[in-house]
Amino acid sequence: MSFKNKLKDYFMGDEYEYEYVDEDNQSEEPTQKEAKVNPKNVVNLSSVQQSNSRVVLIEPRNYNEAQEIADNIVNRRAVIINLQRVDHQQAKRIVDFLSGTVYAVKGDIQKLGAETFLCTPDNVEVSGTITEMLYEQEEYDKGW
């Protein structure tokens, strides 16, 4: 062996020499800190959702305001829409657009009156029904 190799082996060790590490096959038991669960981190989600529930009343004047209504539904707010100030064709387009929005968030849309609708996201539950007593021919022909 050359002097260089001897010096290298002295400081670096022999390249064929391996270190053996004795490993215990015993599994380590978890410490108390790991096993202990902090009960203060548990939050009841239903109470969080109920505290932020809102109902928004909107009376659109044209189809362009449908996006604002849809944004409220996507943000998990119930919306009551009064379509009395919109002509029938635009009102029908608004209802169609909102029906798609409500479907996307797994919500519900209900007719409350002749030109009034309630759109709710999935976090709002509506109970009860409203029935119309008299049907005027004009309202019946609108095709809601």
UniProtKB/Swiss-Prot annotation:
It is found in: Cytoplasm. Keywords: Cell cycle, Cell division, Cytoplasm, Septation. Gene3D superfamilies: SepF-like protein. It holds the Pfam family SepF. One of its GO terms (biological process) is division septum assembly. The keyword Cytoplasm applies. InterPro entries: Cell_div_SepF, Cell_div_SepF/SepF-rel, SepF-like_sf. GO terms for cellular component: cytoplasm. Cell division protein that is part of the divisome complex and is recruited early to the Z-ring. Probably stimulates Z-ring formation, perhaps through the cross-linking of FtsZ protofilaments. Its function overlaps with FtsA. Belongs to the SepF family. Homodimer. Interacts with FtsZ. This is Cell division protein SepF. It comes from Oceanobacillus iheyensis (strain DSM 14371 / CIP 107618 / JCM 11309 / KCTC 3954 / HTE831).
